[in-house]
């Protein structure tokens, strides 16, 4: 799979969506913005389910320009799509090392657990240990581990993420990591800095795609400014967590 195309459906009132369709490629980051209740979660749910005009929005999702038969959608969705929600917790009673080794074995990969863990620890301020129980991981640690797992072990080319800025991880490194591993990443966000990371953003309103916006040169410059503020905030957070006074 190299591309996903989302074709328009209808908004909450039944009015046709005012866009012509959008095609997203592997290695691309696309952000999704809009007020609470505007339809952001429904949009990524349509992508996750490879909707075929049978969801409440009546959108259709194509893979490489081809419609997916109904009998294949569930199996393809589980193979192609990884979804990182806001609240992640493991239910498996195992250590981090056991989980990563088991997942690598299931995927037919030879990537050692220590390599995945090293990647996870690049994006979380609270390091994860191989011997640590999955049930003891914080939400941020769990997300960092799963992002590294998706990048190195998981073959799913589509990654859906809800509000990565609330995960307590380095979002710039995390999203860059997924893109470098040729994932198509869709991120639901309320944060201007995150929204401007992508070349294109989808604006939701009233349950519909209200617009697909290309990032302007002015917004690209603003993104760099917001990035400086983001990194300064990270420095302040690290100082506060060490018990330091802010100067």
Regions found by a protein language model. Give the residues of each.
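H-loop/switch region of ABC-family ATPase nucleotide-binding domains
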Residues: 187-190
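Conserved catalytic segment of ABC-fold P-loop ATPases
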Residues: 196-204
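Walker A (P-loop) phosphate-binding loop of P-loop NTPases
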Residues: 34-40
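Conserved beta-strand-loop-alpha-helix hinge in the C-terminal portion
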Residues: 207-239
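GG-anchored amphipathic helix commonly corresponding to the ABC/SMC/Rad50 NBD signature/C-loop
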Residues: 139-159
